[in-house]
Every structure is written in C-alpha cells, then in structure tokens.
Amino acid sequence: MGNYYYGGQESRLERISWRMWMVEAACYIVLVLLTLVSSFASLSSTTGFPCFVGTVGESSFGGDLMGHGMTPARRDGVKIFFMSSPSTLFVVFSAVFVWLVVAVYLLLGGVRVKMCNFDSSYGASELSSAVATMTSLVTLSITAWAWQVFVLMLSYRQLTLAAVAFVGIFIAGLVFMLSFASGGKSPENYATFNSQLKTVCKDVHAVITAFKAVVLNLFCVVFGVWHLMLVMLGAVIMVLNFGVSIPKATTGALVVFIVLGLVYLMMIELVVSRYVHVLLGPHLGMIIALGIAGTSALSYAETLDEIMYASWKPVAAGILGAFSVIVLALAVLRAVRSYKFHKAAQSKFLQQVASVAQTVKNRARRERNGPRVHKRYYDAVPVDAYEDDPYRQSPRRSRHGEAEDVIYENMKY
C-alpha cells in the first residue's frame, strides 16, 4: 500500500500520535460525563446552584437598566427578553445529548482502529484522524468544559459572563464542525482518502461514512439553535450594560439572527456539503430556532405590546415566516443536489433508501390489509376407509394373476 496516505512507515511519531489521540478522546469523554452531571444538577437548588437555569427569561431586573419606553408602573421588576423555560432546557440538554453521541462515535471509532491495526505503529494515527482529527477533539473538549461554565453563569444570573462563555462555545463549535467534516483535507483529497480507507480498513470506513454523517447532522441541528441563543444573549447584554432600549435590542437581535442564519446555511451549502452530501441538520436546526423565537416573542408579548408598535406581531410573523420559507427552499435544494450526487456516483445510499422505503411500504400494506390468511391443509383419507365401499374398483390383475398396486391411491393430496 505504497500510496499517498498509507505508506506503512513504522515510527515513534505514529505511536505517539495514536496515544495522544486516545488520551484526548478519553479526556473528552470524561468532560462530557461531568457536563452531563452538572447539567442535571442545575435543575435542583439543593446541589449548590442558586437559581433554576431554565427561568432566565422570567427573572426581573431594575427598570433603570431597561432603557426607554416603559411607564413608571412597569419599570420595576421588568423581565428580560429571553428564551422560555422549556426552550432554555432544550438548548442545554440537546447539546449534552449530541456530545454523548459523539462520545459513543469516538469509542466505536477507536475500537475499530485498534482492531484494524494490531500493530499500533502502523497507520494508526491516519486511521484515527479519519474518525476525528486532533483539532476536532480539542475543540470538543473546549465546548464541553465551557458549557459547564455557561450553565453555572446562567444559574447565578451572571448573564454577561454567560454570554462571554457562549461566544467561546460558538467559535469552538464552528471550528469543530469544519474540521470534523473535512478532516483537514480538501474535497478532492478527502474523496481519495475515503476510497483508500475502504481498501485498508472497511470497519473504520463504515464508521466514518454512516455514523459520521449522523453525528454531523445532529451537531448542525444544535449549532443552528445556538445562533438564536447567541443573538438573544447579545440583546440582553446591550440592554443591561449599554442602556439600549428593549425595542431596539429585540429588533436588532432578530435581524442579526436572520443574517447569521443565511450565512450559516450558505456556508453549509458551499463548503460543508462538499464533504458530507446528505446534510439536512442545519435546516432543521434553523426551523427549530425560528419556532423558539416565535414562542419567546409570544411569551414576552405583554411587555412588547407596551413598548413597541401595536402591529409588531404581524410584522414579526411575516419576517420569521419569510425566513422559514427560505430555509425550506434551501433544504429542498440540498436534498435535490444530494440525490443527484449519489445517483451520478452510483453509490449504495440510494439503494439502501429504496430498500428501507420498500420495507416500510410492505409493512404498511400488511397492517392495512390485516393479518395474512394461511391456507388450510386437510389430511388425506386413509386407504382402509375404502375397503367397504361398494363402488370401489377391484385392483387390476397382472398376466401372472397377481394384483397390481395402484400407487396413486396411496398418496396424500
């Protein structure tokens, strides 16, 4: 296998690189477990967290920080414009769930690499980089650690520090998404890498083709929702620290969210989709974020009705609706381009999709038509039952005077 990627050269660097990958993956898994524990601990006040993390949007702040447009009776105890409690909990625990899936992916990939390379000095670092590059592992560890800080700051209602932590999470998540999808290679080299990997180790190739696409789609869903969290935290910081009025901060947050969402979807279509073609997770994430934005605006409608124009609801619904149409159109475009790519490449993906669709169709038909009626088979009548039959023909005689057996009467029908 003397090719560009798999030269089979034994060296200490290969061995050190493989061990560093295992240590980094183990550290990430430990951080994910700690993040899981701290996230569940934030739900209870008996574990040291002062406030429930899901009620940030229901917290009251002084009116002197709320800007202008409020009546004197409304300036005391004003609630900030933020996600509702279910939406905040969804953002917190959906990220933890995706990181747990990534941990399972790394465990499975590491086991497959070890099974494929009994000699750890032979190509193990190249195979492990196919599962996840070191850049991906480092950024994953940063996001898992910073997420604990983010949840802790939300619980203490230190929204400025929470926003700073989330900016770091957002940047690290962006780097992870790009490095994890590309593996640090150009699209042409990535295709060559995968084709050679299928020959070198089919087990690792199976992991990074199917499982990696699932992991990337799940992360893109969460990352799409992170856009809304980022702009909402930015709006809160503008109101609390810089005296920006609530109408301006709310309008600016929605505009920035739409702009960032369009940039995100265009980056997916122009860059990331060249590596992983079946990629509808970003569009689903933006649709979920739009739903969260709409429900948050409705839950904050009492305050917005007083400080904004009376027609803000139709205008906001029209803007969010138009953006959702754009997102759906880009999702259809991504699906069509993915279908054309797999059809031109004659990959097994379309065959597997057709097989699954046919299986589902057959099961639905059976459920609709009811259980299958089996044919009933009856035992043949024994030969002795014809002995007393007066209409039974006597057996034929051979030329020697012996009776011939009629073999067809002894067979069961």
Curated annotation (Swiss-Prot):
Q: Where in the cell is it found?
A: Virion membrane; Host Golgi apparatus, Host trans-Golgi network; Host endosome membrane; Host nucleus inner membrane
Intravirion side of the membrane: what ranges? Answer: 1-19, 110-133, 182-218, 273-277, 334-413
| InterPro entries with a match to the protein in the record | Herpes_glycop_M
Pull one GO CC term from this UniProt entry: membrane
Superkingdom, taxonomy of origin? Viruses
The way it spans or sits in the membrane comes to: Multi-pass membrane protein
Entries under HAMAP family matching the protein: HSV_GM
Function (record text):
Envelope glycoprotein important for virion assembly and egress. Plays a role in the correct incorporation of gH-gL into virion membrane. Directs the glycoprotein N (gN) to the host trans-Golgi network.
Q: Which family does it belong to?
A: Belongs to the herpesviridae glycoprotein M family.
This chain's protein is named Envelope glycoprotein M
**What is the organism of origin for this protein?**
Psittacid herpesvirus 1 (isolate Amazon parrot/-/97-0001/1997)
Source taxonomy: Viruses, Duplodnaviria, Heunggongvirae, Peploviricota, Herviviricetes
Q: Which gene encodes it?
A: gM
